[in-house]
Amino acid sequence: MKQLIFLLICLSCGTCSIYALKCRSQEGLSEAELKRTVRNCMHRQDEDEDRGRGGQGRQGNGYEYGYGMDHDQEEQDRNPGNRGGYGNRRQRGLRQSDGRNHTSNDGGQCVAQCFFEEMNMVDGNGMPDRRKVSYLLTKDLRDRELRNFFTDTVQQCFRYLESNGRGRHHKCSAARELVKCMSEYAKAQCEDWEEHGNMLFN
């Protein structure tokens, strides 16, 4: 009886390790290409922020951590007609709560959207497109289990966004929520996630 219990424990431990995916692969999109795209998007976001300040460049040390209102937010509240897509109080509140993890107000959201755009994963309105995201993430993967995981993750995350109405009208927040959702799935399923984390958007 003890041998049977030992055998069952060994088998269950063996099957647990089988289900932990190695999500980092030499197949698929190259890490260098992904990093280059994100860097370009971050650079573009910085330029857009500088233009929004009337060409004055960054004030102070260039880092805004979301502690209270900054100059840009005060300016947006005084000049509500000049929103540029980011001026309403609700969005500002989202940025402030999320701003502790980012060096710019809306940067993480719009960097994510820029990334999807640059990788041709958006629809005609600039919103992340389910089929394009799924195709681009899986087209070069030979490992069937990993390909299925990515496909399922994309499907589940788009369902989540649709069911909660998140980002339906704002492409930056939709992209950011999609990245967050896919990151959570990867964190839960990929054994090599802790080693590398989500280097692109966190």
Curated annotation (Swiss-Prot):
PANTHER family cross-referenced by the UniProt entry: ODORANT-BINDING PROTEIN 59A, ODORANT-BINDING PROTEIN 59A-RELATED
Protein name: Odorant-binding protein 59a
One cellular-component annotation, GO: extracellular region
Function: Odorant-binding protein required for hygrotaxis behavior in humidity-detecting sensilla.
Tissue occurrence: Expressed in non-neuronal cells in hygrosensitive sensilla in the second chamber of the sacculus of the antenna third segment (at protein level).
Keywords: Behavior, Secreted, Signal, Sulfation
Biased composition (Gly residues): 54-65
One annotated GO biological process: response to low humidity
Keyword Secreted assigned: yes
Signal peptide: 1-20
Region (Disordered): 43-105
Subcellular localization, as worded in the UniProt entry: Secreted
Origin superkingdom: Eukaryota
Family indicated by similarity: Belongs to the PBP/GOBP family.
Knockout-associated phenotype: Viable with no morphological, mobility or chemosensory response defects. Results in defective hygrotaxis behavior which might be related to increased desiccation resistance and overall longer lifespan.
Secreted keyword on record: yes
A Pfam entry, by short name: PBP_GOBP
Basic and acidic residues composition bias: residue spans: 43-53
InterPro entries cross-referenced by the UniProt entry: Odorant-binding_protein, PBP/GOBP, PBP_GOBP_sf
An annotated Gene Ontology molecular function: odorant binding
